[in-house]
Amino acid sequence: MKISGFSFGRNTSKLYYPIKESILSILPICDEFIFVLGKGDDDDNTLEILESIDSPKLKIIHTEWDTEKYPNGTENAHQTDIAISHCTGDWLFYVQADEVVHEKYLDLIKSRCQELLTNDAVEGLLFKYRHFFGDYN
């Protein structure tokens, strides 16, 4: 069984997304992690953050965003599709740039993926999650 993690983003450091924490939260159970990186602004250092992960599992795919061709947020779906097209796993785990998976669930996630791998009635797994809101004030 092979698990592919994936995500996408651009200007994630400028927007204060915890991209490194997000990837590292699921990386232990992934055989590969695909990150589709859109060309960001000159002062964005998302690539450096990704490279600091220093894992052979992490594959960075560089892209250009075309918001004229994909307007009103549909570029996000387009970038997601690009990431999916590079995944080679039996299971694909989508973690967005502002999401993390608690480490106490990693073994359970992996074991359920293994258990359900050949069950054709299962198309995906659903997770309960919590939202945290806050600011710097």
Feature names for model-found ranges:
Residues 11-14, 99-102, 132:
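Short acidic, S/G/P-rich loop/turn micro-motifs used as interaction or catalytic elements
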Residues 3-6, 10, 18-21, 38-94:
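Active-site-proximal specificity loops/subdomain of glycosyltransferases
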Residues 121-137:
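Short beta-strand-to-loop element that shapes/binds the nucleotide-sugar donor at the catalytic cleft/hinge
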Residues 34-36:
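Ligand-binding pocket scaffold of soluble enzyme catalytic domains
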Residues 31:
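Receiver (REC) domain switch/active-site residues of two-component response regulators
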Residues 27:
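Gly/Ala-rich phosphate-binding loop of Rossmann-like dinucleotide-binding domains
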Residues 45, 95-112:
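Acidic donor-binding/catalytic loop of UDP-sugar-dependent glycosyltransferases
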